[in-house]
Swiss-Prot record:
EC number: 3.6.-.-
Protein name: Putative GTPase CC_2483
Species of provenance: Caulobacter vibrioides (strain ATCC 19089 / CIP 103742 / CB 15) (Caulobacter crescentus)
Listed NCBIfam families: lao, PRK09435.1
Molecular function (Gene Ontology), one example: GTPase activity
Domain of life assignment: Bacteria
Family (UniProt): Belongs to the SIMIBI class G3E GTPase family. ArgK/MeaB subfamily.
The keyword Nucleus appears for this protein: no
Keyword list, A-Z: ATP-binding, Chaperone, GTP-binding, Hydrolase, Nucleotide-binding
Pfam families assigned to the protein according to its UniProt record, in alphabetical order: MeaB (PF03308)
Record's function text: May have GTPase activity. May also bind and hydrolyze ATP. May function as chaperone.
InterPro entries, per the entry: AAA+_ATPase (IPR003593), GTPase_ArgK (IPR005129), P-loop_NTPase (IPR027417)
Amino acid sequence: MIPALDIDSLEHRLVAGDRAALARAITLVESRRADHQVAARTLLSRLMPLTGRAQRIGITGVPGAGKSTTIERFGCNLVEAGHRVAVLAVDPSSGRHGGSILGDKTRMEQLSVQANAFIRPSPSGGALGGVARKTREAMLLCEAAGFDVVIIETVGVGQSETVVADMVDIFLALLIPGGGDELQGIKKGLIELADLLVINKADADPAKAERSARDYRNALHILTPAHPDWTPPVLTASGLTGQGLDVLWTQILRHREVMTANGARAARRADQDARWMWAMVRDRLEDAFKTAPAVAALVPDLETAVREGEVPASAAADRLLAAFGL
């Protein structure tokens, strides 16, 4: 167990805005050690009253949409305007190849050196649920440290868009200018998740970008909006030149104003918290199950038998559950 005095010191330094303390606290919540997890829960419980005041922004994008460039320029603009900006990532594949955000941190040289900015690579290893848990806790720590804008990036792998959308106030999709073929290629689910669409790289061909924006606006008309008071705007912008990023921030603030006034923002966060509670229950139960000695002793042989078709998955599951006492 980490001594209580260390947790006290870490808490005080983090609340004072110490980025090194914030990084250490995030490392603590990412740890799989049982004593570290207990300490992390203690720290988070103490800090909860200081969370919830930040604008939580999720950003995803199609390949080549210029997410890193846009996030850096957008973040720098917000810092210059007096905000404190944290950038986190959800990358369930980071345990295999290091995660794109590691490269992003290197490329975000201007933002990373800002005193009022904090960039954190995706936690490595584990399934998407575990990565999401660590990222959500990192978001709360950033808020407690005084960051009033938290940007969570998804690399767009599998269900990561849904996971990120379920921990933020507004979810942005970065797209690239294109014609009908490109429009058809965009996943409908991504468009339905987005609260705001941005046609990026508009500086290269403004007319083409505007045509794409018009196409997406038309496409949105056939979809039922997630909330009757909000139709997702479709903007054009350039992360390279900064064009349109001021309008983007204005729309984010408008979304917050509308959703706060009608109660949807509070309801969205309440629903997220309830789902988060059950996700934590599942996560803790799975950890307890997999680390139980009786279960761990059976897993290698049963996994091999299932893979080779010798034992049905349902029968193997029954044996594991019985070993756990269920």
